[in-house]
C-alpha cells in the first residue's frame, strides 16, 4: 500500500532528523 509506505518513510526521516538535531540542541542549550 503506497501512501502508507510514503508516510512511513517521512516519519523515519523526521525521526532521523530529531535524533541528529537533539544532541546539537542540548549542546547549544548548555553553552548559552
Swiss-Prot record:
Superkingdom classification of source: Eukaryota
Keyword annotations of the record: Antibiotic, Antimicrobial, Fungicide, Immunity, Innate immunity, Secreted
GO annotations of cellular component type: extracellular region
Chief location bin: secreted
Subcellular location per the Swiss-Prot or TrEMBL entry: Secreted
Expressing tissues: Hemolymph.
GO biological process: antibacterial humoral response; defense response to fungus; defense response to Gram-positive bacterium; innate immune response; killing of cells of another organism
InterPro entries, sorted: Cecropin
Oligomeric and partner information: Monomer.
Function recorded in the entry: Cecropins have lytic and antibacterial activity against several Gram-positive and Gram-negative bacteria. Also has activity against fungi.
The family this protein is said to belong to: Belongs to the cecropin family.
Name of the molecule in the record: Cecropin
Annotated organism of origin: Oiketicus kirbyi
Amino acid at each position: 500500500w503506497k501512501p502508507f509506505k510514503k508516510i512511513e518513510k517521512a516519519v523515519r526521516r523526521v525521526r532521523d532528523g530529531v535524533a541528529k538535531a537533539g544532541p546539537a540542541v542540548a549542546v547549544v542549550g548548555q553553552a548559552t
